[in-house]
Regions:
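Transmembrane helix-boundary motif of multi-pass solute transporters/channels
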Residues: 13-53, 238, 249-252, 256-259, ...
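C-terminal membrane-solvent junction of multi-pass transporters and transport-like membrane proteins
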Residues: 91-97, 340-351, 384-441
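Membrane-interface "cap" regions at the ends of multi-pass membrane proteins
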Residues: 1-32, 61-66, 70-83, 87-94, ...
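Extracellular loop-to-transmembrane helix junctions
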Residues: 38-64, 144, 391-395
Length: 458
């Protein structure tokens, strides 16, 4: 092993990898998108399809990316270049590397919104925040959004500056158990409300009558984005994984963790909405309106609304922070590997990039609302469309091609089974990566772009 590989940062244990990777996967999408899609596309049948895709498609992609990272001990650019110097390898690596650099600024803007609402509930603004006008006025105020964006950004980069073991691993090990406890407490509170059982039944019990093609497409897209696939994160974190750890067992724990939080989010939100709306799931809206308008209205109508609001936004804050940390680490790792910069210099440069691009997003609903791109998209929406709908599916397709055409499925299997580690679902991996994963990724790319262009509606 080269001296460069010996010096590379590593997670100290399997738990460190699992909680850090789970922290990257458990994010805002689990809380503001999964419950909405589950409610819209059949409840229990959506959940069943989602679980099947997680055990096949999701499993295959996180195994592939983690194995590529560990076998090369490189961030995405170096990992792809390890297998060839052709321009296609460079392009595949750089697409994976650029994605987190573009996502983390606007993601941190939304993280700042979460900080603002958490602070608001702590201050006791429960009634004021239960109005759509409160949210609209806040995101339209450039000074306030920029302030909270910078607060969140500094928190993220402070953890990154501390390093892998002393920063990311310690923070994830502290935050993720608390996140689970909060999710369980809020779910118990939601499902014990009068009238909540109808929502629980709708969410958990499959009804084949609710099945449609869009159930599969929406579940596929949600699973893809939820697991941090094609963001460079799993390749980077895989490169920090010790050689004696089982890739299959570790990534399976990440799958379970991410799915459990998504299910708890569904139990937390869907029954509460059923109670609030007298059994009408159509009031659920995806994205910011669910988290910053609908949920505050529900909290205001509940007993102990202020306490529930604090717990909910603390949960969302932990989810947003751990995901942003993972995105930032992937970017910093690329700077260190490709430009040979120190962690300090890489962190400072990322700070400058985040402030520049994040400010565009922070002001996109206020002072810069007159500037739109493509289909009248504000900056934040455009960055989200570019990365999630276009670049990530392309990056995932590049990973499939790299594994099948260059490394070979047996090459990945050899890495997974290093030191006699298990690879129990090897047959599933081989079939999925060769045949179904590229097909699924193509569907995600088409449906994502078509959805934004208005050809189909989610």
């Amino acid at each position: 092993m080269s001296s460069e590989k010996q010096k590379r940062s590593k997670f100290s244990s399997r738990l460190g990898f699992v909680l850090s990777a789970a922290g990257s996967a458990v994010g805002l999408g689990n809380i503001w998108r999964f419950p909405y899609l589950a409610a819209k596309y059949g409840g229990g049948i959506f959940l069943l399809v989602y679980l099947l895709l997680m055990l096949t498609f999701g499993y295959t992609m996180i195994i592939a990316e983690s194995a590529i990272g560990r076998m090369t001990r490189k961030s995405p650019v170096g990992a792809y270049a390890h297998f060839g110097k052709d321009w296609m390898f460079k392009a595949g690596g750089w697409i994976n590397a650029i994605i987190p650099i573009l996502i983390v600024p606007y993601y941190s803007v939304i993280g700042g919104w979460v900080c603002k609402y958490l602070f608001g509930y702590i201050q006791g603004e429960t009634e004021a925040m239960a109005t759509a006008e409160y949210f609209t006025e806040f995101i339209g105020n450039g000074v306030k959004t920029e302030f909270w964006f910078l607060i969140f950004t500094l928190l993220v980069l402070w953890v990154i500056f501390m390093g892998v073991e002393n920063g990311i691993e310690k923070v994830s090990t502290f935050m993720m158990p608390i996140l689970v406890i909060l999710a369980i407490l809020l779910s118990i509170y939601a499902i014990t409300r009068k009238g909540a059982f109808a929502g629980v039944k709708y969410f958990l019990v499959p009804n084949i009558k609710n099945f449609s093609w869009m159930t599969v497409v929406s579940a596929m897209g949600q699973m893809f984005y939820s697991l941090s696939i094609a963001m460079g994160i799993l390749i980077t974190f895989g490169s920090y994984m010790k050689s004696d750890l089982s890739i299959e067992e570790s990534t399976s724990h990440v799958e379970v963790f991410d799915t459990a939080i998504a299910v708890l989010a569904g139990l937390m939100i869907i029954p509460a909405v059923f109670v609030f709306s007298n059994g009408d799931p159509s009031v659920l809206k995806a994205g910011p309106s669910l988290m910053f308008i609908t949920m505050p209205k529900i909290f205001a109508s509940m007993g102990f609304g202020r306490v529930v609001g604090i717990l909910f936004f603390a949960l969302v804050f932990f989810a947003a922070l751990t995901s942003a940390i993972a995105l930032a680490e992937s970017a910093v790792s690329t700077f260190q590997d490709e430009l040979k910069w120190s962690r300090r210099r890489s962190t400072v440069v990322l700070l400058l990039i985040m402030v520049a691009l994040g400010t565009l997003s922070a002001l996109s609903y206020g002072p810069l609302s007159f500037v739109t791109i493509l289909k009248n998209m504000p900056f934040l929406d455009f960055f989200d469309f570019l990365t999630n709908s276009v670049m990530m599916p392309i990056a995932a397709m590049a990973t499939c091609l790299l594994v099948v055409r260059v490394i070979g499925v047996e090459g990945i299997a050899a890495e997974v089974m290093r030191k006699d580690a298990p690879f129990k679902r090897k047959a599933v991996f081989n079939f999925m990566i060769k045949y179904l994963c590229p097909f699924f990724v193509a569907i995600i790319l088409f449906s994502s772009v078509a959805g934004v262009l208005g050809w189909i509606k989610f």
